[in-house]
Amino acid sequence: MAIYVTLNRILEQRGVTLTELSDRLGMTLANLSILKTNKARAIRFSTLDALCRELDCEPGDLLAYEED
């Protein structure tokens, strides 16, 4: 089982850079980069909520599931 964060796709669709998102959310660029590159082992609901609010999307838009 593999769950992926599709932040890169959403950012491209919205025309937003990771740096802009970092500034808007008050999150570090390093933490957002970890999410964007799928190196995160977990994500807090508060982070998911903030991303959804800022990017005007649903949690399912930011996450994808693929079977191994």
Where are the predicted features?
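Short C-terminal boundary/hinge segments that cap the last helix of small helical domains
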Residues: D56-D68
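The alpha-helix within a helix-turn-helix
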Residues: L11, S22, C52
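A short, Lys/Arg-rich alpha-helix, primarily the initiator
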Residues: M1-V16
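DNA major-groove recognition helix of helix-turn-helix
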Residues: K36, T47, E66
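Short, basic-rich loop-to-helix N-cap that marks the start of a DNA-contacting helix
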Residues: K39-A50
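Short alpha-helical DNA-recognition segment
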Residues: V16-I34
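Residues within the helices of the helix-turn-helix
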Residues: N8, T19, D49
